[in-house]
């Protein structure tokens, strides 16, 4: 019954008592449904697609001079997770999300440019197996080449009841694009506090993969860069120190980020490669070096050996997967262990699925670097 038909009350005298009751019941039901429809109203297609994509994410278990400054997080609230036993992973498909199609592309969308960044050559680069190290320090290439031939300064125990690895995120709110096409929404600050869409989702895949391989791994999901980006490294340092005090068995601390490479025209770069027929984000390890002054890293040589071992492993397993290790005068709290590194998983131009897959591949490479090729 349409709402306007309710005014046709001149029929009522001709209805019996039972028929009158039925008519009034039907009329009331129609009015309720009509009002509900008016209140709900139509949902724009792009908004619907984004909502579906985020629901799919929630249900899925889930720098270099070129980098640009990024905006503040888009969401409100802060969260942290205590370490939990991670579920074994049977494949990347269980983590992947539904991406937005071109029907959701807004007017004025920015462009994304895909690029595979090759290994470097020349005097600034030191060969590292199939990979390479970009030397932005005063250390000689010969010194670096000799150093990375030495064994790892630590050993990890497989199937240990004690944690061996900690994964955390200084810039946890960094995120990725949610579009399948090469575009991003105008005004997208590439940050979110949604831990199914930001760096925590990538760290989760890495931790699951490492735990499934017998490497006891903790994953901290503290949003160290929220609500303030300033002071995020001080925040994450305190987090790591608490874990090391509670779990002195931890040998490796990985600070997992993503890069942000952008052209002068505003196009976002997506470092990509193809592994086993699936597109993945490229990754880049950053290892700091002591400069004798403002950057104090007495254990930089040990960290560099670790970086080289991981780089060799990843690039050997997945050719084209890594960008050269960046060896530079950067601190990044890498004084806390002899196995402390920062790794960039793709950039803000990559879509989330490429980053999730890259996280799994990077973890596979770490397993081989720490346990050997026969694991």
Predicted regions and their residues:
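Active-site-adjacent substrate-binding region
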Residues: 299-326
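Active-site-adjacent mobile loop/cap segments within catalytic or ligand-binding domains
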Residues: 320-375
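Envelope-exposed proteins and targeting segments
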Residues: 161-164, 213, 250-252, 279-283, ...
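Alpha-helical scaffolding within the catalytic cores
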Residues: 240, 265-273, 325-331
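N-terminal catalytic or cofactor-binding beta/alpha core of small enzyme domains
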Residues: 17-250, 260-265, 360, 368-374
């Amino acid at each position: 019954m349409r709402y306007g038909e309710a005014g046709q009350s001149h029929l009522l005298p001709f209805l019996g008592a039972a028929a009158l009751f039925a008519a009034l019941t039907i009329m009331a039901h129609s009015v309720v449904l009509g009002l509900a429809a008016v209140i709900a109203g139509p949902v724009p297609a792009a908004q619907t697609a984004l909502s579906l994509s985020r629901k799919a994410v929630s249900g899925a278990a889930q720098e270099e001079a070129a980098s640009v400054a990024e905006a503040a997080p888009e969401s409100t609230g802060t969260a942290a997770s205590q370490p939990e036993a991670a579920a074994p992973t049977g494949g990347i498909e269980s983590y992947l999300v539904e991406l937005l199609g071109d029907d959701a592309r807004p007017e004025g969308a920015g462009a994304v440019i895909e690029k595979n960044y090759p290994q470097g050559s020349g005097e600034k680069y030191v060969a590292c197996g199939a990979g390479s190290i970009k030397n932005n320090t005063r250390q000689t290439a010969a010194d670096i080449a000799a150093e990375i031939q030495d064994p790892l300064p630590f050993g990890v125990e497989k199937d240990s009841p004690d944690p061996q690895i900690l994964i955390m995120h200084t810039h946890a709110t960094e995120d990725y694009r949610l579009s399948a096409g090469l575009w991003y929404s105008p005004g997208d600050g590439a940050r979110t506090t949604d831990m199914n869409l930001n760096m925590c989702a990538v760290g989760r895949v890495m931790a699951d993969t490492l735990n499934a391989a017998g490497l006891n791994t903790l994953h901290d999901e503290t949003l160290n860069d929220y609500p303030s980006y300033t002071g995020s490294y001080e925040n994450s340092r305190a987090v790591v120190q608490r874990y090391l005090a509670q779990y002195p068995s931890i040998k490796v601390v990985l600070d997992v980020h993503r890069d942000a490479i952008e052209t002068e025209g505003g196009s976002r770069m997506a470092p990509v490669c193809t592994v086993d027929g699936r597109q993945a984000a490229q990754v880049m390890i950053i290892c700091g070096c002591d400069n004798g002054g403002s950057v104090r890293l007495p254990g930089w040589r040990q960290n560099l050996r670790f970086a080289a071992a991981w780089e060799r492993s990843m690039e050997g397993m997945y050719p084209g997967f890594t960008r050269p290790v960046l060896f530079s005068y950067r601190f990044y709290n890498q004084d806390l262990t002899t196995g402390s590194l920062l790794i960039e998983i793709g950039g803000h131009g990559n879509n989330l699925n490429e980053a999730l897959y890259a996280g799994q591949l990077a973890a596979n490479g770490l397993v081989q670097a720490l346990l050997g090729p026969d694991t």
